[in-house]
Amino acid sequence: MWVAAAPLTFYIALIGLGVIPFFQRHFLYAHTVNSLWWSDINAPEGWGFANGETIYAWHIMPLPLYLQHEARVATQETGLCHDFTRTESFRLLASDPEARLIISFHGNAGHIAQNTRPDSYHALTDTSSYHVLAIDYRGFGHSTGTPDEKGLILDAATVVDWAINVAKIPPNRIVLLGHSLGTAVASGVAERYALQGVEFAGIVLVAAFSDLATMLSGYRFGGLVPALGPFAFWPFFKRILDRYIVDKWHSADRLANIVRHTRNRLRISLVHAKNDMDIPWTEDNKLFRAAAGETIGILDDDEFDSWKESWTVQTSKDSFVTTWKTGEDTIIRQELFPFGGHNDILGFAPVSLAIMRSFDLEGTAYD
């Protein structure tokens, strides 16, 4: 009997700890769960990158550009760089009037070089002309401090400020790329700049969620164990959950606000894998509706579904693309892809294509 009761007791204790802000933030961000005990992320060569192109955050140069300047870049001092502006890598980024920069915001747990993250940087830079700037938020990896919603958005804004004001990359040559938790960070920093009238080349959100309480109601640990167990099926429980969650991460509201405050040009791309076992792909439906709803007015559920269907191309039984364009140069795009899971999708073609479209390298499909 005691053996049978032990898992239930543990689960109830876990839920109880989850309402305490200290434990809740450790559960959410998992920032102390990483491989720094046996990995040195100040030596990115260990993940297959060319020598000499890193800073506190990682700056990953496009490999073709590295090849052109290999003699000077490869002879730079390796390891942690305290003044990136004195490096050849910075000079190549800042002196190129056509440089394109992707600022990458990773998901929870670990650091910028953990698991499949380096593979995604390779996918974006190995054959392109794009620079990638990937950061660890406060409390993650070697970064100091403790993570919270306000702090992570401030970290992201600091990096964007640096890119615009120090590296002199204009916003129309910057794409904000977020994955999982990073989609909430990207949405938060994009909203912050939208309120100032700043418009980026694009906002690409991969495996996103509408808000933390809603996401948790469908989240499964390892894709199998429901985070909230039977509580997820109680309609009033989400309201209780939202009351106790300290970091709300209301991304759907933020996307709507971004659309509302955009005056000229906007590109929002939502990419999700059908076989994502961590965050349900249906979360993108809520984000798309929040963003598109700002341009089409209020529709009831049936009216919106009918409207959306008219702008959707079903590419297979497990995939579709919905593209909504307005006369004000706003494009909101949702793509469901059959494969890629929660993490590997970052290295799949739909993400790279979404970034290309953000930089106005438009194709002809689904127009």
Question: What are these model-predicted stretches?
Answer:
Residues 52-162:
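Membrane-embedded segments
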Residues 262-265, 269-272, 276:
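Short beta-strand/loop motif that positions the catalytic acidic residue
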Residues 176-178, 204-206, 271:
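Short beta-strand immediately N-terminal to the catalytic nucleophile in serine-hydrolase-like folds
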Residues 278-367:
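C-terminal catalytic histidine-bearing segment of alpha/beta-hydrolase fold enzymes
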Residues 64-99, 263-265, 294-326:
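Intrinsically disordered, low-complexity domain-flanking/linker segments in eukaryotic proteins
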Residues 1-50, 298-299:
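N-terminal membrane-anchoring alpha-helices
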Residues 188-257, 277:
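Hydrolase active-site cap/lid region
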Residues 178-182, 186:
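Gly/Ala-rich beta-loop-alpha elbow adjacent to hydrolase catalytic centers
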